[in-house]
């Protein structure tokens, strides 16, 4: 599901695009880098973990892509400025900047150390603002360019037990909308927001877990490659909003119609889910340092949590539809 006008920005350069990707060391970032490398793209890959970045770069180079690795913590504005300078020197021009960094801390808000919540907001909101500040200045000089922000369904509907993550995603959406409005007089500069459902990437396992329970993620989890393909398509057809997964659109509508009923339902759903989940160690994950566990594109959760893609999609859509029915009934009663 996509919205916004179609343009021709980037079509002449998109054959062999020049792209910057932050958060490129695993998951969606790695999948996007590999997809672009297969098209012969010239890439600048950034993340905190040098070893994981180099592994991704090697895969991309085997596809014939030219790749520059720039270890970067996007929470540091000076580091992102340095990344932009190196990217310009290596690429010459930037067709697309993919702002993809994302971390999370799962647990009841009062149980999550406030330092962890701070770090989540700094990475997921301020980090994306640092990316945008660097990218937009390049695009204004070029008079064209595409900024892609990876947001998530959390930008439309808050996720209980992930309060800081939800705050950062709502903030990202507001920031993108404001930035897009400021750039309205520049028809060849685009700010594109991507909102996927839960993605089966290593990010979930890498994140901070203060619940004492194993976090698997609810089905139907998305293949990171599906999200990557949506990002790559933005080179040819930039759009303001890209929603991936049928549940996201349904949740967006239900939240708009009956936000209180929706929030209560989400709280009960995740509360019961965590109560039944196997026990696991409390750990800060990648919030304060790069992941220690291996990266890669996949998280391995789809094989554990889903029997078939079709069956789980039907189940998830059915659950959302049931929640929608309850929410609409509650909304109608409140209007009487």
Language-model features: where?
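Substrate-binding pocket helix/loop in short-chain dehydrogenase/reductase
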Residues: 108-109, 116-121
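SDR active-site lid
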Residues: 184-278
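Hydrophobic alpha-helical topogenic segments used for membrane insertion/localization
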Residues: 309-335
